[in-house]
Amino acid sequence: MAVHRDRDDLWWSGHAWEDYLYWQSNDPKKVDVITRLIEIIRREPWTGLGKPEPLKGSYKGWWSRRIDQEHRLVYRLFDMPRPPGKDTRESITVIQISQCRFHYD
């Protein structure tokens, strides 16, 4: 799976990054909503805006938030060792985005 790293703590799958670029070109207001949801996830991963819900089945471990009635932001969090020389934390929590367009498939 191709991964686009926006920051050390935010990773996009290739599919999710294509979704994001689609919104940049076709509906910039959706980009604003996605950005806001990511900011909220950083503070409150399991509660807050977008009606967060844990997913089941093959998506177990992933969460979904509503971008709007049709589209969902699908994400998960995991800890990993800090990047060398970046800061003093022993680990960082990474948000991995799987998709941000359509309902999870």
Regions found by a protein language model. Give the residues of each.
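Enriched for short, Lys/Arg-rich terminal
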Residues: M1-D9, Y22, P28-V31, R65-R72, ...
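N-terminal first-folded block
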Residues: W11-T47
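A short, surface-exposed loop/turn module that caps and links secondary-structure elements
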Residues: E39-R66
